[in-house]
Amino acid sequence: MKRISSFDTGLYAGRVIAFLFLCCPLRADAISPNEWRFRQTLEVGQGGLVRFSLPAETLDAARPNLEDVRVIDSAGREVPYIIDRPLPQPESAVRPKEFHAQIEGTMTRLNLVTGTKAALRAISLEAPGGGEFTKPVRVEGSQDGQSWRPLAEHEPVFRMPGGASNLRISIPDGAWAFLRLTIDDSRSAPVPFTGAELNTGALSAPTEPMAVSIKSRDENPGVTRLSLNLGAMNLTPASVHLDTPEPLFARTVTVAVPQIGEGDITEKILTSTVIYRMDVGGKTESRLDIAIDRPVEARELVLLIANGDSPPLTTTGIRAERRAVYVMFSSAQAGRYALLMGNSQCAAPNYDLSALAQDLKGAQSNAAQPAGIERNPDYKAADALATVSLTGATIDVAPWGFRKSVKMTGPGTQAVELDLDILARATHDLGDLRLVCDGRQIPFLLEKTSISRPIPMAQSVANDPKKPNISRWSLTLPKAGLPICRIVCTPGPGVFQREFHLSETVTDGVREDFPIALGTTTWRQTPHQKPRDIVLELNPGPTTDRLILETDNGDNPPIELNNFRAYYPVTRAIFRASPVSGAPTWLYYGDGDASVPRYDVSLVATELLRSERLVASTGPEEVLKATIVGDTLTGASLYLFWGVLGLVVVGLLLVVARFVPKAA
């Protein structure tokens, strides 16, 4: 193969640029800058190929795929350009030609014949079963099987309670004919490693620091939810680094982003990894970076940290890096250029430069730095949210039973969390919710989050004397019909293993009672285990406000359970408020015959998702129409109602009987 000299490379780059000038001259096509909302000036010091990185604020103002970005010169003429998104080349895995494992005293020795000349960057071990372990590993490489070079020392491999595991050992990039792994078994029994994969080296890609902050933190049972503000939209986070003072830990972290579903907003999982800090052979090893490398259109990134039975992980800070995005164009001369972005209607440009893209990426170029982003004072086109009517059809609210006022701090996109009153009175699919202002509906989207809120539950012992081996607890919710997803309680001291059953008693149309199973779980508490809360997932959720939890103690003493609380998922209504309307906004609910609304707002759901939100709140509940008392009662209240009603009927019959003339 002919070697290309640096002179040849420069000459070829010059030919590429010359070709650009000849075949892709500055366009004289008419362009109307007033159709773009934002612009940035760009000072070019000399003619030639210009290459610069797009700031986060530019990516934030543009469309996700940058179809609306334009480059214009000082005369307002459009300049062809190329977008370059360097991304890391993904790893590939190969099986070693030979794999041999043997135990030598207090160590396990793994000998691998790689069978490849590719550069290796990691070894992933295979260990069947679910046993827990933590092992330090030493890795050595050799080309002849005789002379060995150390590649890694005290690298941890582990499998922890709760599912956190790491069987990957990173090594410096390099090609090796032989690999030798020595695993220290002096502190625990050997682990049967049965195979391995060799991860070949991947090409790296440039990154830039990104401004990121923790917007909110929510503690769910066994899971910490961190909502991160990325500071801009349309970014590709490369990695997120968590700062924590915890000396020893291992956690599985799941990364998710909000996404548009069927008329609502849910959370989509992007990736999952393990972060840790542990003592391995007297040396502290840690991995606190969470690799992502996925485009994120919204400003928000969600981290779900699985704590298992451990306390929540303390976080003192967070850092992140994003993948760089470059623009390249050919400048005829030095001068001032401008970037335009923020046009939701324009089509993507077609400059016919795709064939030259790879050549231009390696060509010598001049650097430039865009100035700060500015609003275009001549911008005329309306944005997507402004083109959508803030009001829907008129509505007759007579069928609705309840309403609450919605209190807002200003105009713009709003997020109001549905409280217990609304969740209990609304239909199970929330299809009867209506936002109303001045007699007309306000279109909205429902956001279903991974946040869950606790509700304290009243508890009492409800043992049946006829079943002395069964422990029963009566649990009372503040309202019937709440969308409860789990019940959590704290057991007393002691050693036990029990199967718990949760149920409720419902009444059908003819007032006959029958039990409904809501969930079951088996829980174990051993002498060497830290006490942990009992968690019972519900499927389905309850319809009444009274639940029964029971367990069979067998021949063992009964156990103590305290601190019962229920959890429900957080749901928000996302809508846009008018900047001029002074009429109050109401949230109506409680109409079992209402169908799910269909709004044109779904056409701009992405814009609602990506825009900054203000937090709205609800006022006190207002009852709009009378209800049949018996239909609103459940559990003991229902029995008391019908008992009292029966006594009243009997009393009335006795009174009437006294006034009936006796037969002669």
Predicted regions and their residues:
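Bacterial N-terminal signal peptides
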Residues: 14-25
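N-terminal secretory signal peptides that target proteins for export/translocation
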Residues: 1-12
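General helical structural elements
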Residues: 6-7, 19, 662
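Extended non-catalytic domains of envelope/secretory-pathway proteins
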Residues: 31-664
